[in-house]
Amino acid sequence: MYEIEIMPSLDKILQKLSKRDKKKLKAILKKMEEITQNPHHYKNLRHPLNDFKRVHIDKSFVLVFTVDENNKTVIFVDFDHHDNIYKKKKLFKD
């Protein structure tokens, strides 16, 4: 099993969801736990973001993460509507 690390930008999103949409937050946290069991099961994003993986939540939303094999850590990067994820590619590369 892998450890979980959450980027500060995603942490802000999760905090907002804890106040506005607890059902969606619960779905995200459950999916994070599933991902730590086998993170390589999930698909990579398309180029130029192919270092990142994604999983769909509630049909039109995507949770983006990357895997650090050296530290056995799954780093969760972002959660947003599917249409917006690729527009944020600069965020992922910094």
From Swiss-Prot:
On whether Transferase is a keyword of this UniProt record, the answer is: no
Origin species, per record, is: Methanocaldococcus jannaschii (strain ATCC 43067 / DSM 2661 / JAL-1 / JCM 10045 / NBRC 100440)
Give the source's domain of life in one word. Archaea
SUPFAM superfamilies assigned: RelE-like (SSF143011)
Question: Is the keyword Metal-binding assigned to this protein?
Answer: no
- Record InterPro entries: RelE/ParE_toxin, RelE/ParE_toxin_dom_sf, Toxin_YafQ-like
Known role: Toxic component of a type II toxin-antitoxin (TA) system. Its cognate antitoxin is RelB4 (Potential).
Which Gene3D superfamilies does its entry note? Answer: RelE-like (3.30.2310.20)
**One Pfam family here:** ParE_toxin
Q: Specify the protein name.
A: Putative toxin RelE4
Protein family membership = Belongs to the RelE toxin family.
Keyword terms: Toxin-antitoxin system
